Amino acid sequence: MAEVSFNPFDPEFRKNPYPVYDKLRELDPVHLTPLGFVVLTRYDDVVNTLRNNDFSRDIELNANLPETPTRKFRRENERSKSMLNLDPPDHTRLRRLVSKSFTPSAIEKLRPRIQQLVDDSLANAKKTGSLELVEELAFPVPFQVISDLLAMPTDRGEELREWSQIITATLEPTTGVEDLEKGQIAIGKMRPYLEEVIRHRRKNMGDDMLSSLISVEEQGEKLNNEELMSFVILLYIAGHETTVNLIGNSMHALLTHPDQLAVMRETGCTPNMVDELLRFNGPVQHTIRTPLIDTSIRVDNQDIKISKGSLVLASLGAGNHDPSVFTNPHELDFSRRNSNKHLAFAAGVHYCLGASLAKLETEIAVGTLVKTFANIEVASEPEWRDRLTIRGVSRYELNVS
């Protein structure tokens, strides 16, 4: 097999990973890295892996990993597994219960509130002519939406935000012990606060998602206290992190494709446009699985063996730029007919539960920004997050008028 390297820590890869994906897909689509994990870059291989129950999401339980300080810390300090890392049937039960709060009709009811939050977030930019996209729009809107959904008190919003950001950093597979320790401290502060909120809500049920999660029942089963707590923490983290990066990536895509920006100005932002923005530069680039059995993937006339318990990095970003599925994949094209085949929200049983919410928030935030300002220019080049899994800008200064 031809020599090709995958170094996700290279600053150039952080800025633009897609040329590396192209080379891997062409020369070594089932790539074994020096670190011992396998990288998949073909669309069909990624989809098949995510939909195959012989591949587990529970890495700590099923992967053959060397004992490291990081792994030891995770094992000794995790009180319960997030739904993100559970396999069926445990995942199936939890998902069935919590999905009742994420129906399309329930999400669509949020449109007026999201619009209000976006309008409020852009008010200052109308006066100053400048907008720091992440701090002033991409972060506060989805974070407040999640707080509203759970009917959280607003008195400790800044603390919740700080805790959430610290905990989010621990989700990266490359996280070190120092960040994990910070995450445990943040969870230690967050849990008592959320426990008090949940106790209060049990006595004062309302028309909010937290009340719904407390009361939801199916076939005699309900969420226990630990499951409820784990899911509320997950909501706070995943509920805003994806959208923050999606909004930032979307504006970067539009400002580097002025022809498509002009199309959006003319028609408004549509759900299909959001799908194309997700395909073009999605906020989640990779997801990890481990096979429960020895398996193989066919490349040309050869079966590439993947051993039970090995780590498999299914590259969502690479799949979204596979030319065998998406013609001219490196072009942002709002006339593309199959944009909705993107893998930005993964596939299979772990398809993102909050996908419809993230899409609605992005549709309104990006669409309103483009409609509100006739001129949007880059004041300084974006700073990209130093993450393996998450792709997004940490800072993006714009001039608007």
What are these regions (language model features)?
Residues M1-S401:
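Cytochrome P450
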